[in-house]
Each structure stands twice: as C-alpha cells, then as structure tokens.
Amino acid sequence: CDEGALRQVSGRLRPAVIVVTNLFRDQLDRYGEVTHTLESIRAGILAAPEATVCLNADCSLTASLAGDVPNPVRFFGLNVPCEATAAGVSDAPRCIRCGGAYQYRYHTYAHLGGFYCPHCGYARPEPDTAVTGLTALRPDGSTARFRCGDDELSADISLPSVYNVCNAAAALCAAGALGLPVRRAAETLGGVRAGFGRMEVLPVGRHEARIILVKNPAGCDRALDY
C-alpha cells in the first residue's frame, strides 16, 4: 500500500498485518519531510487497531511507531553489520525522541543499523525475526541465516542487495504474524522475481542490462554500491 494512502484505506480494509519497512526522503514533493510521512503511517495504523504491526528494528523512525500505537507489534531486522562505517547519506541523524545525535554499534546502510541515543536511551529494539548471518551476497541474490522466534533457518533470496535481505526478514515476520509456517515461507524466497523496473534484467544484444529504481539519496547510494 502506498504510504500516502494507508491512512485512507486501512480502516476499511481491516488488515490482519501491517508491515512498515523503512522511511527515507522519498517523493518530498508529495509528502514533505520524513516526519510527515511517519505521521501519515501512524494514522493509518491507528485506524486498524486489530492489525499486528511488523516494524523494521534497524530504522529509528520506523521503530519509533511501536510507542505510539496500541497494536501488537513485532520487529524484524539485521543483527549483522553490512557497512564498516556510517554512510554518507542519513535521513535520521538525530533522535526522534530528544534530538540528540545517534550513535551506532554497527551499520547496515543509510541510517539503518544498531542505533542508540546516549542522551535519552532510545535504542534499536531486539527483533523477533532477525538476520543472524549473511552467508553470501551475489549480484543475482543472497543467502542468509534467520532467527524467527526460537527457529533457526537458512534461506536463498533470489533478489540482490542488502535491502532485499531486509525485505525477506519483513516477509518472514509477516508470515509469522499471520500464523503461517515460517520455514515454508522461507523456501519461497528463492522464487521471488523482480517487479517492473526494480532490479529487472533485460537482454541488450549479447549482454544483459539491469534496471535499478532510484527514488531517494539512500536508494542512489545502494545502486552505486551494487
């Protein structure tokens, strides 16, 4: 669901699960600052109080929603670093609670990672569904280890880049919230295909071209890293 439409439709659709992946400076001409988008998502969640909300523990903005809604909440995220140092692009350098500068125990990408505020104590929550290891990061996909509650498993992911590993964790978190067999859900991750314009591969003569969608500075950083 489009982040701008969630507040309009969630009360009517009455979803069982709402997944919020991350917040970046995306389409500022439509939504303004990321805090405006966050408020819109919060309103959408409040309109569906029976929905279980799956939040990205690595995103300080997304994770903050847990304290603002009465819904049952589950977290997903990466328990392993993906970048040695802080990225040059950060949409959330300061604490959403007190305004202090975040520090990080490790970084995944952009402003995502093991954040904590030394001033007020707001910090990354422990995820219910966690990536505990990255066995392989390939141009065409990856292999990762997951902890889903008490269950440990490994899965192949057919889409490349770290952010798709995070998306896989989100999918497994949602599957668990819906009461689906998580191991069976993990087996399907290797069969996911790219959507139109998102890591789509097109034949160009004797070569292949990959289309990488870029909508914000963080996405551009990931595209250049790829």
Predicted regions and their residues:
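Cys/His-rich short segments
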Residues: 78-141, 145, 158
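Conserved mixed alpha/beta catalytic, RNA-binding, or beta-rich assembly cores of soluble enzyme
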Residues: 216-219
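Extended interfacial segments that mediate partner engagement and assembly in macromolecular machines
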Residues: 141, 149-152, 156-163, 169
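Flexible active-site lid/hinge loop adjacent to a nucleotide/diphosphate
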Residues: 3-110
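A conserved, hydrophobic alpha-helical segment in the catalytic core
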Residues: 13-22, 112-126, 159-190
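Residue-level detection of beta-strand-connecting loop/turn positions
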Residues: 32, 148-152, 206
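Gly/charged, well-structured mid-domain segments that form the phosphate/adenylate-handling core
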Residues: 139, 174-210, 214
